[in-house]
Amino acid sequence: MIPVVALVGRPNVGKSTLFNRVTRTRDALVADFPGLTRDRKYGRAKLEEQEFILIDTGGIDGTEEGVETKMAEQSLAAIEEADVVLFMVDGRAGLTSSDEAIAKHLRSREKPTFLVVNKIDGIDADAASAEFWQLGMSKVYQIAASHGRGVTSLLELALAPFMEELVEESLRDENGEITDLTEFEDFEDEEKDLTEEDAEKDFARLQDQPIKLAIIGRPNVGKSTLINRILGEERVVVYDMPGTTRDSIYIPMEREGQEYVLIDTAGVRRRGRINETVEKFSVIKTLKAIEDANVVLLVIDARENISDQDLSLLGFALNAGRSLVIAVNKWDGLNNEVKEKVKSELDRRLGFVDFARLHFISALHGTGVGHLYESVQEAYVSATKRVGTSVLTRVMKMAQDDHQPPMVRGRRVKLKYAHAGGYNPPLIVIHGNQVKELPSSYKRFLMNYFRKSLEIMGTPIRIQFQNSENPFEDRGGKLTLSQERQRKRLVGAVKNRNKK
């Protein structure tokens, strides 16, 4: 399961700065879908091959009535749900009573906690960090979040238990005490150039696996009723797979020879209905379920307007690149006029996910539930279907013939060839000249062209653009071996002619 890292600390210690730096590229993926609401407190990030969820808990002030009463409930929830806590303090401001109150609470939780002294750029880092030893943490780590100094190394240490390579030993100083991480390179989320070999590994990993289906949505939309309907119809023996108390319930089942694993989340509460703690717990469970799923089934209540929280859940699913099916529940009992209004509203607000199948169902009575399987399978097949380089290149050239790429700095962008870069979601890698300069409008055109030509339904498509290297670049006017030989022949011919 994907790890969750929580940023904890009093206001203005740099939590948001660190959050924005670490999640900036991953968050940008949502921008491909205009009109989508993004929750900025929760972000996906990736360090090497390790994906993780980062939570900005907001500021905590425990100075007046004690940390248990003054902490925001969502921050408490995030601490409980997190696998790792990064406790941030301000190296310039020094130790405060709020820091001490927060540290006391964190020590009582026995959670893997890293004390991070931020804002040490331009000052004596060791001197600024010394007083924070009073907080009783086993180690003190030093970073400058605004410049990214030490961030990568800190994350490597925090995520070491979840990564294949443990890097803690190589980063420990001679005394094994204060680890100054600022000498290491800045945190950069560079895009890895994906190859056909990467795609084949991805494809092999997905073979002979059950379809993992996460059923998500706010409470009272009928999610539990739908799960019971599905399991009741299939007459399967239900048992809970091993997991921690904070994980979702995994339920294996089979239908018509196809194996599934249903991931039952706790749902996401709307603020005002219940307290913040339960809501935040639910968000984290849902995020982890989405990451672990192949296909996400979002359940929406037909009798309530689609909410920003519904759109935020969609954003998480799209950001994770998951296949998507949408079920509009409680459709029975609505008159035709109301149904038309609901359809119109859904078309208006869900236009950016027109690739997802939309079903109108009644989980209580079973109406339309059977058709969900068809869309789930269609989405999964689309997300994992192997497509060869020749086919992808042919489709790319057809798109280029139909609509030429624009000019960039007086030169026409040239698309050379395309190949698969991964699956679930399908990732297409396009090579060419100046392809990274293509405008968003042309990238969307290519995405839609591939979708239509390859009949991909139910899953987002990602395209990575790689500039082809010029084999003559940086040669400084040097001739190739064949050119050198030709030059010698020409010089020899001229000399012979002059002798005559």
From Swiss-Prot:
Residues 481-500 are annotated as: Disordered. Coiled coil: none annotated. Belongs to the TRAFAC class TrmE-Era-EngA-EngB-Septin-like GTPase superfamily. EngA (Der) GTPase family. Residues 3-166, 211-384 form the EngA-type G domain. GO terms for molecular function: GTP binding; ribosome binding. GTP 1 binds at residues 9-16, 56-60, 118-121. Residues 486-500 have a biased composition (Basic residues). PROSITE patterns: G_ENGA (PS51712). InterPro entries: G_ENGA (IPR031166), GTP-bd (IPR006073), GTPase_Der (IPR016484), KH_dom-like (IPR032859), KH_dom-like_a/b (IPR015946), P-loop_NTPase (IPR027417), Small_GTP-bd (IPR005225). GTP 2 binds at residues 217-224, 264-268, 329-332. HAMAP family: GTPase_Der. This is GTPase Der. It comes from the Bacteria. Associates with the 50S ribosomal subunit. One of its GO terms (biological process) is ribosome biogenesis. GTPase that plays an essential role in the late steps of ribosome biogenesis. Residues 385-469 form the KH-like domain. Keywords: GTP-binding, Nucleotide-binding, Repeat, Ribosome biogenesis.
